[in-house]
């Protein structure tokens, strides 16, 4: 028998209250208990109900909590979360037995989801960027048999787009959908420096160590790059690492780290020019790169007239404060987090003096 609406409202009100540990038994008897701990709720900035438990201290969306309850075949919570407003149709993604399917039908679920609904749930679930949520998303999506049996071309395209800054996008064509999703969540963890999630993926997927390195370089995560270089055996040359760091503009932190480890600043400048990363190009000159004429020729070949014009000026030189080759990520971050290229400033001043 389903709880009445009044019961559901009462439980929702109780879940918003602070309850002392001595009274936890009340929450357990009321069904506000999950993973051996109490359930509490709060309303986020988007006026959405968030579920907080011992496992999800930062909170997860109500719909996400519902599908997790479906995956666990927790009937009481399936009914409770549905009465609180969760979309029971999303439960279809994670049903693993007929009894739970019948319960979802009774609660109003249809027989199957449209691709658009799957994508909507994917976006709703992943939007909270925390370690616990990224790990949860991986567990929900990466090895989901349901997703293996539907056409997920649209989702693949979304993942390609979000990882467009990585130079190895073509690698994603050669792997299974499950492996692609795993790499995607790992990449998100590195991009936002989610340390608990990074450690989770590092321990569970040792064979993805190079992927972690690629993500750290491409997403300008000097902290994780330093961790990788000091705790694992890196099977990539320092100049190849610099090449990856230079593929995305304004990647000063990881470019500098590679430079400090001995990467060639001239080579980095040429790569930056080739990829039309103008801020990186200026930064490489700050680091002492002096292949001006070679870079001009390369820019001319690619039709980058603005770079040709920039490099036609004889006003560029190294910035002495960058030549100490510091490898402490905290110090690098302090040095460069608000850094404006000395050579870009020289170019700006030249333009002001000559065109105003």
From Swiss-Prot:
Q: Which UniProt keywords apply?
A: ANK repeat
One biological process term in Gene Ontology: taxis
Look up keyword Magnesium and say if it applies: no
Q: Where are the ANK repeats?
A: 61-93
Question: What's the domain of life for this entry?
Answer: Viruses
* Function according to Swiss-Prot or TrEMBL: Plays a role in virus cell tropism, and may be required for efficient virus replication in macrophages.
What family name appears in the similarity comment? Belongs to the asfivirus MGF 360 family.
Please identify the protein, giving its name as recorded: Protein MGF 360-3L
